[in-house]
Amino acid sequence: MRLPHVLQEQFLSLARPNTLKNIETCGILAGNLKNNVLTITTLILPKQTGTSDTCSTENEEDLFEFQNKHDLLTFGWIHTHPTQSCFLSSVDLHTHCSYQLMLPEAIAIVCSPSQTPNFGIFRLTDPPGLDIISTCRAERAFHTHPDKPIYTDASDTGFIEMINFDVNVVDLR
C-alpha cells in the first residue's frame, strides 16, 4: 500500500482545532487499485462528533456519495489521540475490525501529536486479532481483550510504502 508522506502533516493541520480542545478527529483513507497496488490518494474528513477518547462519523451517506462519484475505494481510517500515546484502544480495535473485514489490507493510522512516537500505522493480526475482535461481545465501549498479539505495526512489515506525492483532501464537516 502506498501512502503520501504529506498525509500526517495535512491531517494534523485539519485536526488542530479539535486537538487543542482535546477532541479526537477522524478521517477516511481512500484511493485506487492499479497494477495490484493500493494507493491512498484522498483523505476525507466526514461530518463527525468527538470526545477526548472517541470520534464517530455522521451522515455517512455524504461520504459514500462522494467516494462513489469519484470511484474511490476505502483503504482504512486515520484519527488523533490528542493526549494519549500512539496505540489502538479497544474502541479503535472494534472500529478497525469492520474496515479489515471488508478489505483485509485495510490500515488504521493513529496520530498522537504530543507523544513520541507520534504516528503509527496498524492492522489487526490474522490470526488471532481479527477473530478475537470480530467475535468479541463486550458491551462496554472500553474493555480488555486477551493478552495476545491482536494488532501489529503495519509499517514494520514491508506492506507500507511512504512516497512523495500529493494527497487530495476533502473536508465534508
Could you tell me what each predicted segment is?
Residues M1-T74, T83-R173:
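Conserved beta-strand-loop surface patch within small alpha/beta domains used
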